[in-house]
Amino acid sequence: MKQAVIVDCIRTPMGRSKGGVFRNVRAETLSAELMKALLLRNPGVDPNTIEDVIWGCVQQTLEQGFNIARNASLLAGVPKTAGAVTVNRLCGSSMEALHQASRAIMTGMGDTFIIGGVEHMGHVPMNHGVDFHPGLAANVAKASGMMGLTAEMLGKLHGISREMQDQFAVRSHQRAHAASIEGRFANEIYAIEGHDANGALIKVDYDEVIRPETTLESLAGLRPVFDPANGTVTAGTSSALSDGAAAMLVMEEEKARALGLTIRARVRSMAVAGCDAAIMGYGPVPATQKALARAGLSIQDMDVIELNEAFAAQSLPCVKDLGLMDVVEDKVNLNGGAIALGHPLGCSGARISTTLINLMEHKDATLGLATMCIGLGQGIATVFERV
């Protein structure tokens, strides 16, 4: 079987969704800038050999509608001979894009793909136009469609206290801030134009959503936002609302080697899994278990792990049941996570994979895992190997 490899991976800075640096920048532009950048950064790749552009996006309406993958690729100047498709596995959409490209490569259905995803949550709100079928209530509780309440449920089932959540959130901001000021995000962020608070055009090369001033004391003062009477999940322990995109150049390994390209990582294994929608945040556990089994590996073999931080109350049960509690500080989300950086839905799978690959290079690690939960009860996971 042919092997799928990552030749390059980049992301935009993460902009704050409410009045942030990308308030005047459309989702197609965020996407197109990265597509163009991948081709500029890799002149050895003939754009005419691109088989498909596979782009994740959840809210496929307004500026994100009518196949944003094609709209953005045309905007970017990707050759018209390349296909383009927008995929939606909710939070796992851009990791799904990676999986689709990898499967195509493994089965000989193309050797060069641009994949990634975007979500401009400031322009297209997460719940815009959502209309669940009334009959769904026969099988799934209404609260299962409310992500914050599913985090509350999962946290309660696993004994995750408010204090544990606050500590996890502070860690996310502290680590993301340290990574930012120490330049550890520099290799993954592709600077693009945005606007400052006064409306002046600026080149944005930093994540706007990190809050370095976050402390246990400041978080302790926040009220539960999803279950005000009995809950523990606050805005401070939930992923930030942000706007952003991430992209990867995925190729067949022998083709990349023949072109003399640097291979940054190989896709070792992939998996998706379902779980009860009421505890949707638990999805990374079965997805990771499947991906590891397919690779013939164990969680102990993973040198670096990126777990998307939808909520602290969701992340901690996954850390616990994956057997990672004792190695969190050494292996898990070493540059912070979505609590600090935000979770632009369609972007996040490619974003955490990009961060993971850069961390693997920084630590000279061999194996890494990127995994995330998905609304309504799914998980997705990818094992990467440096070669």
From Swiss-Prot:
Assigned protein family: Belongs to the thiolase-like superfamily. Thiolase family.
| Organism the protein comes from | Shewanella amazonensis (strain ATCC BAA-1098 / SB2B)
InterPro entries linked to this entry = FadA (IPR012805), Thiolase (IPR002155), Thiolase-like (IPR016039), Thiolase-like_sf_Thiolase (IPR050215), Thiolase_acyl_enz_int_AS (IPR020615), Thiolase_AS (IPR020610), Thiolase_C (IPR020617), Thiolase_CS (IPR020613)
Tell me what this protein is called: 3-ketoacyl-CoA thiolase
Describe its function. Answer: Catalyzes the final step of fatty acid oxidation in which acetyl-CoA is released and the CoA ester of a fatty acid two carbons shorter is formed.
Please provide, in alphabetical order, the Gene Ontology terms of the cellular component aspect for this entry: cytoplasm
Q: Give yes or no: UniProt keyword Ribonucleoprotein.
A: no
Pathway assignment: Lipid metabolism; fatty acid beta-oxidation
SUPFAM superfamilies cross-referenced by the UniProt entry: Thiolase-like
Q: Where does the record say this protein resides?
A: Cytoplasm
Q: Which reaction is recorded as catalysed by this protein?
A: an acyl-CoA + acetyl-CoA = a 3-oxoacyl-CoA + CoA
Main location, first listed in the record = cytoplasm
- BP term (GO), one: phenylacetate catabolic process
EC supergroup of this enzyme: transferase
Recorded hits in CDD domains, A to Z, give: thiolase (cd00751)
Q: Which UniProt keywords apply?
A: Acyltransferase, Cytoplasm, Fatty acid metabolism, Lipid degradation, Lipid metabolism, Transferase
E.C. numbers: 2.3.1.16
Q: Which GO terms describe its molecular function?
A: acetyl-CoA C-acyltransferase activity
Q: Which Gene3D superfamilies does its entry note?
A: 3.40.47.10
Q: Where is the active site?
A: 91, 343, 373
For this protein, the record's PROSITE patterns field holds: THIOLASE_1, THIOLASE_2, THIOLASE_3
How this chain assembles, per its entry, is: Heterotetramer of two alpha chains (FadB) and two beta chains (FadA).
